[in-house]
């Protein structure tokens, strides 16, 4: 498997032929609102406070991080991405591009193009790995 640690609102996704699963949990105001049932996940995508994070890396080297173990089989993918991608590309678009793409580099190019077309800021970052 793969060990993933996160803080803030960058995400990790496990992608297989069967679907896409978000591994990490955002440390954000809207994620807390979704957890409490105040808003839906879809409403969170458009919420005016969606970029307010409750934890972040900064000058203080000690950060309260969450850790996850993701079992992975050969041929499966791990996508690490910033909120610039998450806020503009849907999970289903990510799944489609990764599964039907032509290798990790081409998939990332297509995902970044979709994000730009949907109005993403310049700070869209993503890494896609396929387990051999």
Say what each PLM segment does.
Residues 1-16, 22:
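Conserved catalytic micro-motifs used in adenylation/nucleotidyl-transfer and phosphoryl/amide-
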Residues 3-5, 21, 51, 77-79, ...:
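Structural motif
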Residues 5-6, 14, 45-46, 70-73, ...:
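Solvent-exposed alpha-helices and their adjacent loops that cap or buttress functional pockets
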Residues 7, 17, 26, 50, ...:
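ATP/adenylate-binding site constellation spanning eukaryotic-like Ser/Thr protein kinases
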Residues 11-14, 29-33, 88:
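A short local loop/turn or secondary-structure capping micro-motif enriched for an aromatic residue
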Residues 17-19, 37-47, 99-106:
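Short, glycine- and charge-enriched coil/turn segments that flank and shape catalytic ligand pockets
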Residues 25-74:
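Conserved, helical-rich catalytic subdomain that frames metal- and/or nucleotide-binding sites
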Residues 55-81, 85-132:
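C-terminal catalytic subdomain
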């Amino acid at each position: 498997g793969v060990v993933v640690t996160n803080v803030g609102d960058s995400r990790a996704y496990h992608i297989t032929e069967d679907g896409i699963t978000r591994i990490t949990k955002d440390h954000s105001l809207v994620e807390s609102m979704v957890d409490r049932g105040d808003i839906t996940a879809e409403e969170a995508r458009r919420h005016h406070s969606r970029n307010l994070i409750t934890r972040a890396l900064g000058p203080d080297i000690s950060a309260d991080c969450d850790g996850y173990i993701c079992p992975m089989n050969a041929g499966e993918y791990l996508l690490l991405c910033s909120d610039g991608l998450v806020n503009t590309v849907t999970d289903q678009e990510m799944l489609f591009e990764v599964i039907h793409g032509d290798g990790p580099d081409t998939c990332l190019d297509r995902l970044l193009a979709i994000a730009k077309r949907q109005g993403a800021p310049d700070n869209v970052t993503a890494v896609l790995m396929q387990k051999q």
